[in-house]
Curated annotation (Swiss-Prot), chain B:
Protein family: Belongs to the WD repeat MORG1 family.
UniProt WD repeat ranges: 23-62, 65-104, 107-146, 151-188, 189-228, 233-272, 275-313
Lineage, broadest ranks: Eukaryota, Metazoa, Chordata, Craniata, Vertebrata
Free-text function comment from the UniProt entry: Molecular scaffold protein for various multimeric protein complexes. Acts as a module in the assembly of a multicomponent scaffold for the ERK pathway, linking ERK responses to specific agonists. Also involved in response to hypoxia by acting as a negative regulator of HIF1A/HIF-1-alpha.
Name of protein: WD repeat domain-containing protein 83
Origin: domain of life: Eukaryota
PROSITE patterns for this protein: WD_REPEATS_1, WD_REPEATS_2, WD_REPEATS_REGION
InterPro entries, A to Z: G-protein_beta_WD-40_rep, WD40/YVTN_repeat-like_dom_sf, WD40_repeat_CS, WD40_repeat_dom_sf, WD40_rpt, WD_repeat_MORG1
Any Gene Ontology biological process: mRNA splicing, via spliceosome
Pfam families the record matches: WD40 (PF00400)
Gene: wdr83
GO cellular component assignments: catalytic step 2 spliceosome; cytoplasm
Amino acid sequence: MASDEDSDEDFVTYGTPLEPLEEDEPSRKPIPVHEQTVKDEKGRYKRFHGAFTGGFSAGYFNTVGSKEGWTPSTFVSSRQQKSEKHNARPEDFMDEEDFGEHGIAPREITTTDEFASERKDQIKDKARAVSSLAALIPGDPGLLEEFIAPARSSIGVELLRKMGWKDGQGVGPRLKRKPRKQNTGRVYGCSLPRNGSEESEEDDDEFAPENVTFAPKDVVPVDFTPKVDSHGLGYRGLNPLQALGGGSGSGHINLFTLQSDRTTNLFGDRASGQERRGGIAGQAFGVGAMEEEDGDIYHKDSMSNYDNVLGGEEPGDGLYGWTAPQQYTKKKNALKRVMAYSGRILDGFALASEVTEIKTVYPPPDLPRDFRPVHYFRPVIDPSTVSPIVAQALQLSRGQLSQDASQQGRHKLDSTQRRDMLGESALQGPSSVFELLESKDRERLTEIRKAAESQKPSESNLSSAVDRAVVVASAKAKAAALQALSSRFQSSSTQPQPPSETQMALNAWSGPTADASKTFKPFSKNPQKQARYDLYISKLKQGDKDAVELSLDSSMTEWERGREREEFVRAALLYKPSSSSLSSRFTHGKHEEDTDTVDVAQEQENDVDDKQAAVKMKMFGKLTRDTFEWHPDKLLCKRFNIPDPYPGSSMVGMPKVKRDKYSVFNFLTIPDGSQVNPSDPKPSSSTIPRVTAEASSKKSRWDVPVQASEPKDAVSAFLSETRSEVSATQQTEAEVKTQTDALPASATSEVKVAQSVEKQSDQKNEEEEEEEEEEVRPSMDLFKAIFASSSDEKSSSSSEDEAEEEEELAPPTSEAAQSTTTSGTVIPPIPAQFTPAPDINKAMDLKHLTVQSVPSAETTAQSTQSSLNAPAKSQGLDEEEFGPRLPPPGFVPSTHSPQMKKQKKKDKEKHKGKKHKKEKKKKKSKKHKHKGKQKKRHEESDSSSDDTDSNSEDVDRDVPTSELLQRLKNLKNKR
Amino acid sequence: MAFPQPRPQAPQLPQHLWRTVDCQQGAVRAVRFNADGNYLLTCGSDKSLKLWSVSRGTLLKTYSGHGYEVLDADGSYDNSQLCSCSSDKTVILWDVASGQVTRKLRGHAGKVNCVQFNEEATVMLSGSIDGTVRCWDTRSRRMEPIQILDESQDGISSLKVSEHELLTGSVDGRVRRYDLRMGQLQVDYIGSPITCVCFSRDGQCTLSSSLDSTVRLLDKSTGEMLGEYSGHVNKGYKLDCCLTDKDTHVLSCSEDGHVYYWDLVEGSLTLKLPVGKAVVQSLSFHPTEPRLLTSMEGRVQVWGAEPEDAAENES
């Protein structure tokens, strides 16, 4: 049966179920006897003491002494504190498990007297019976008591009375008169002849009024008294009092309880008006000697006497003896005529008593054809803050607009024009959108102006420059308007969304890196929300600027929308494509035990920032210390010869609490108002959420004490269209093009990918990507090229040794790198070698490339940002290790060679060399070449002289696969 | 007291080189005295663990069975068992006399940095780069750890066990003290990745060295800093630190080839013992006498308070 599976869960089970047997599983070792332990529900071991000496719980869980049991209580009584009289109850001497489900005094939740039904209390009855023996009036114990005791009705009855119920009525909604039943009663077995009362009901129909309702009939609840005797069904046996004393007038002894409790309960209404024929009657018994009639002896039973439908119709006519006046019936008939309905009425449906009014629906107003649901504010730019070209361009465009503004109505006018037309005075607040802009954006605009000024384009160029500026400015203004819009729509309860975040999300997703199918689904719990999020992501990918607004559900309240907007943007940032490429490496677990919750340590550590501050001030102690509850394993305590600090607790480790697993708010912290301050003069602090700040601090202790996390260049974090259009084109692109002409097209496209990734990389991303590097490690070649080039172009000697190493590892590529590194470009040129498949249109290749370029972009970004960070960073890249490293193994005596010593020295020098600052780049590269060759020779000699040397781990790490192959070949040749 | 305290002797610092042992096992990742200080254990990067006599400098036994370089070792109190851990993610319990592997315990997800017996050698505790400390039962044949302490957010670099406490230093910059008797975990934030932790001999203080080239002495009960010792170089490598046998001085390895001695109370640099040119990777102080072991690259040096001849004459 299908329902079996469902009902399985409803069963109460005891014990542990056997694990399902799997066929292909290797047969497990049986658990040895000494490991088969019995534990109670708290995980305490149970020892069996014998059934008559305490069972499992002799003493206080197999120990002497207990909380209360064995320690003598002290009697203290003073003047101030009188000792209370302590009545020992039996419960005081019971164990915990005695109160359990199977104990001798099980504790269960019971209803209090007040709420209890009037069911008889068996215990009380017994008590009463006992006390009755000693009562004043023998035989009737509670008689006096019941006289005195106040009448008390249960709370249910009280409630019912309040609701209008009266004694004797049934419970339920009041009924209209029911259509008459055909068969008022069922008879099982012996049927009794009908009485007159039932026949009289037949013509009740016309008296039933329409608008009078009746309380339902009272139904005595079914009392399932168990059958304890061995008589047949319904047979009561002789009541000696009745039989001998002649209690009943009829002189007839009724052995059958046809009107017993059972039947009355079930068919109470049927029998109510009936006077039953007494005596033994029925087929099986024939006609008694005292009966007058003997007609129906050979009664034939027919199937119509049996009920073959479970449940069935409710007996009763619903009239309750009330005779309706004549006019009611007439009215009813009239109504019936009005509502005459030609069709058949389906079962379970009834004709409506009233005709519903048809509501008139007004169509929505027609929208004008050029109506757009989003309003863009027209920029009002102060000519003093913008370059003359931009201002000029704007004026030009506005001039055009204002010309036809008069014809097109007020929507085409901007606020100042309208103000002028109305003759109002200027508002006190910020007069231009520019003041609403963030300082960064303003800076950027000034940058544009500077760039434009420095260029001083010729007259012929001017027009194109103006065009471009117009485009840029309008895009700028659009963005600003959007920001203003979004901030306006957000209610005051939510923080204004830092506009940079939407921008960042856009940047993160709009690139070709986004892979639709493999994105993480943060709202998979809520499919609708997830659908909305998916829409948002897909819009992001298309580069839609107001993706959030469009993807939100318009039917939601404003507050909800604001909330969801924030969530989406953050989720988009968090689960951006680079991390999805990571997640694509893993498959989801087939079997999740509990998807809703995750264990989280109950006590959380204090703020790390505070601690860092304390450490800086050398104020160790309370500030830097956290104390947690920690539960050692029982066995561990035993092995350490230490009493269990938490006896009776089966927990191990830190106390855990369940938390929701996939709520975004577990991972995100809503930025504080203090942190997100749009008017913050500092460029970076206002835009980086708190999470990232923490993350960066975590990162800093990664391997080497990195310098305190410097504020990163904000420009790289937010890349607006302005930058890509103006600065990129004007400054870098030209240079890049002139110098990297030799590179194949694929390389440049990859550079672009790298750039786009770089754009989005704020500190948080870096950390994630750093972790990712451990997993998705690109080929060594890529690192080499980047380091070789970036270190050179920065011309900082700090990364000298890395470059050295890399060059020594790959002499062929170093030259390629050199040729390209003479430039001072921001974008690292990547040698052609690294684009194995020139066909970039293939999706696979593209993906491959993007994966590779993630770390590279990151490292380059770092190297360009802070030369100080570079050594630490690249060290981390070189090392696969976490935490403090192991010193180099030095040299094994067997491979003692002067050359090696030399290398050692150089190593030292390298360490010192970190402190040097700048050096000439060309000189260095020459040196590198030289060194590289030398070292390569060393290594080769090393590997040839000592093949079995296994401690060259450090060396091995840095060796590219190509060289490893070469070495292997050498080995083979020797053999 | 009826008798005045005997005048404390001037602390003797091991500064005379007694002998150098070339271990022939690659880089010596760790050098450890045994429980009574008569023998020493060297963990080689060639996957072998070696047992030496301190007084004669002779090799007694080589224990091979690890799959990668051995990173730490410890001897039981009764010298009957050894434990060692390795980059191959295993912890091995050895029988000293036979040199056989008694138990090879797998479970760590990364290389195992440190291992210790508890006082009665009933439990081995191993800390790994995977951020967990695992407590292995040596008594039963269970291959699963008794308990896994996964509170650390980063790799465990060092670990020490006292009678009822467990001290771990982690790369997440925290020193954790698990007090079994109290059922408490106390976390002290240092900030910089911890390379080594020690208890003081009196058990009241903890010593921790971190990658900011600082050794700190913290009060065990309150977490307050009692002393800060710096001057040495410890920026990238996992180096050891320790206290002398009488808690008078603090010792630390350094990347500049010296062992630094600081006065515990004053915090001043007492001695800068030149060991060699490379990094002094590991050191171990004799449990009762002023003797020191240092390891640099493939060699182990034994240092005494006075020249060896004088010491031998005395004894």
